[in-house]
Amino acid sequence: MTSEYAELHCLSNFSFQRGASSARELFERASRHGYQALAITDECTLAGIVRAWQASISTGLPLIIGSEMHIENGPKAVLLVESQTGYEALCKLITVARRRARKGEYRLLREDFEPSSDGLLAIWLPDIEGDAQACLAHGRWLRERFAERLWLGVELHRGADDEQRLADLLALAQSLGIPAVASGDVHMHARGRRALQDTMTAIRHHTTVAEAGHLLFANGERHLRPLDALAEHYPDWLLAESVRIARRCTFDLKQLKYEYPHELVPKGQTPTSWLRELTERGARKRWPNGLTPATRAQVEKELALITEKKFDSYFLTVHDIVEFARSQHILCQGRGSAANSAVCYALGITELNPEKSNLLFERFISRERNEPPDIDVDFEHDRREEVIQYIFRRYGRGRAALTAVASTYHGSGAMRDVAKVLGLPPDQINALAEAFSRWSDSLPSPERLREYGFDADTPILKRVLALTGELIGFPRHLSQHPGGFVISEHPLETLVPVENAAMADRTIIQWDKDDLDLVGLLKVDILALGMLSALRRTFDLVHLHRGKRWTLADLPGDDRETYEMISRADTIGVFQIESRAQMAMLPRLRPEKFYDLVIEVAIVRPGPIQGDMVHPYLRRRNKEEAITYPPKLKSVFERTLGVPLFQEQVMEVAIIAAGYTPGEADELRRAMAAWKRHGGLEPHRERLRTGMLKNGYEADFADRIFEQIKGFGSYGFPESHAASFALLTYASCWLKCHEPAAFTCALINSWPMGFYSPDQLLQDARRHHIEIRPVDVRYSDWDCSLEPLDHPDSTRNLAIRLGLRMVRGFREDDARRIETARSKRLFSDATDLTLRAGLDARAAEALADSGALRGLIGHRHRARWEVAGVEAQRPLFNDLPSEDTQVTLPLPTVAEDLMADYATLGTTLGPHPLALLRRQLAAKRFRSSQDLLSLENDRTLSVAGLVIGRQRPGTASGVTFVTLEDEFGMVNVVVWRDLAERQRKVLVGSQLLQVFGRLESKSGVRHLIAQRLYDLTPLLTGLDVRSRDFQ
């Protein structure tokens, strides 16, 4: 009879470059072999334990939670969780070991163990080949700590000395009075993963497989072996002992009890009463004329459900964070599903008035869905750290931490790691990387490999690609989530291990953001949004120069001039609708009101595009197609002309037409979002179809709805999310239209952000007749600023003065000292500037080269001469007479100034580079962007321009969109996949690009369909012009 067995020492791929199999693969194989349980014991981490728990549930095979540990100057052991007490003890041990070491490492000391270590079982893995006395000492120390909860692990892997090793281990166990147990040191689910495991070992140790030597296992026996194979190596009683240990380990992750912090509640209040009071206060501000009956009913419904689900403290915490931001003059706005909530609006978390929208609260919280809400709040991108540190101060690092993201291997990165350890030279690795797609994880086809000069049948290449395919999708390391916070009433280390983040002053839990819902932890996302920084700076500038303090809430709505500007696609620099695809859509959709912007934000997304929703909507909007939908679904489809554009509409259709409950509809939403990655949508096909047919809907309508639903698997927008973003879109457009100087100035001061570089933003401002003044130490602060025009008109009475931040390599500290010194008296010459502002030679030379000393000293050549040799500290020589030898230096040429501008500032206020080349280009019959406005459709022609952006959306079937800029404006170029592949080097490498192609002009949108590309970069003669590619 084959013995029963439980594997107590097994590493998954969440051991990061050790285990060569996923938890799912391990549990499926162990279940197939008839194991009684499986322990996942990744080294000093529980990063993969939630996924292991899910794999355990799906297979029915019990999970034992544990971790392999190396104690500094001590033994190696596997710690297994017996009870909740033991789980908390293990989390604390991992936390303390990780927190005292730098990221990616740990240091576990003997003194970290509690005297009793209750709830933890230990399997000692002795080094019997090493120092015998040290080995005995390790065993005695463990026996003192764990007593009857300690075993000696016997691990045999078909070595030549297995028989002797078994005898020695059993003798050691007997001499110390420690029972023995069989374990496998499993690193893979099947022997076939040995090559991958060897590869990962070499990657981890920064060596090649050929040179890894003893670092590699001697054979492939560290896999989940069948029971009969185990019985050949181990005595039955050793195998049976593993099952007895497994039966002691009864802890399950569902036993975790998570509580949100309570300290935000004043004395005499409960979380429920305090949330209601804050909501009522906010409601009086939001609705000064009182709530309508419908809104009052919605608020009451939400408060009741929040209390029922015990989420009161969560809402109070988010409110507290938002209130802190506002007290610090940090602009913020909630978005996503939280925008469905009237309570969130009343609390000031979101800005979307539910009375003016038709949003679905069940998208946010559902009685039937046993999971927490997810509130995302955007903050100014350059001030978010203040909010993050406030949370750490408010709750302490023991109770607040950021969530992790399990960064996984992707195609090119996986190949590079594999190829390197297999010994390929760097030039071949770089060339092979070119054959990998930037936009998918699929391996290159043999045809593509041949295009890049590789023989697809070469054994080494086949091996590289095979191992790369296995490695893709494996966890590579834990990184920090952009802003997802977990905050707890009790120390987080009792729930999950905490470790140091790569960034200073930050800590992260070991669980991925996707794990949190499964174990019931609530997360609040503290996200960064550059446009909020730009809007707040714009509001400040307008207040400074106009005396008017605007807010997001009180900007004039439905402004005709703003919508006319939007419909012309005059949207460079604004939020969301500045991309190449959005600007092409705007003249076709021609937004006239806020809800049109909501649709515009949502419609240029992979979901609606792949669900074939864009063209039907446009045809119906332009009265080219009849608007049809079942009368019962009028409330769902009327606002989008019968075309489902939002996730909420799909949920409403499922509820009304197919009989889904709100909770079931939310499950459908989740399936929509994840079906391409995890499947799970097909079961809904029949459910939807049957329900819709039963309720009298046509079969073709049901089928069409399902196909559109599948499109949402490619990032369809929730309406609440689109509406939140549309608020910022409108605000940025209104400011661009009515306060263009302030808006452009704020954008540059908030950079890096958005789609365009400062140079492109300034070129656009100049095309809008905004005066741009150069960097000048007599007037410039660190930030760009606004100055009155000498002869102001009624509308454009402010100019932009470029700030010292524009000077490449110039430090903010130096700029602040210039501001301070200048406030006392004006600078008289270079020596006065350098001495009083404490500038070193490098800083003074940067100012001279950039032209910032032109007003003080003269042109660049003169300024460079003047600052040469001037030092910041010359106290011994201050009173000595100086010899001032005047040197006559030639003025820079226009071309020299242009090159120096781009080299030092990244922009120019002189002529556009293309203006200097226009005569040369015109002689070759090149057209300008201005010419294209009057040329007829289908004309073939050539244009040339600076490449300011390249995009290749995932929904574009390999099409690359290129934006060129000349002295008059921009040209949009479409490069089909075959041409992009043939001329990849020219397409990706050119700064100045010539395109020969066919002009396509439809509905006010003009593109040039490329037929041939030419690199004209040599004509720029070293000009440093940088594009913003694939943003």
From Swiss-Prot:
Matches recorded under CDD domains: DnaE_OBF (cd04485), PHP_PolIIIA_DnaE2 (cd07434)
Query: Which reaction equations make up its catalytic activity?
Result: DNA(n) + a 2'-deoxyribonucleoside 5'-triphosphate = DNA(n+1) + diphosphate
Q: Which UniProt keywords apply?
A: Cytoplasm, DNA damage, DNA repair, DNA replication, DNA-directed DNA polymerase, Nucleotidyltransferase, Transferase
Q: Which GO terms describe its biological process?
A: DNA repair; DNA replication
The residue stretches assigned to a coiled coil in this entry are none
Q: What top-level branch of life does the organism fall under?
A: Bacteria
Any one of the GO CC terms: cytoplasm
Tell me the compartments it is located in. Answer: Cytoplasm
- What Gene Ontology molecular-function terms does this entry list? 3'-5' exonuclease activity; DNA-directed DNA polymerase activity; nucleic acid binding
PANTHER family membership:
DNA POLYMERASE III SUBUNIT ALPHA, ERROR-PRONE DNA POLYMERASE
Primary role: DNA polymerase involved in damage-induced mutagenesis and translesion synthesis (TLS). It is not the major replicative DNA polymerase.
Name listed for the protein in its UniProt record: Error-prone DNA polymerase
Q: What is the lineage of its organism?
A: Bacteria, Pseudomonadati, Pseudomonadota, Gammaproteobacteria, Pseudomonadales
Query: Gene name, please?
Result: dnaE2
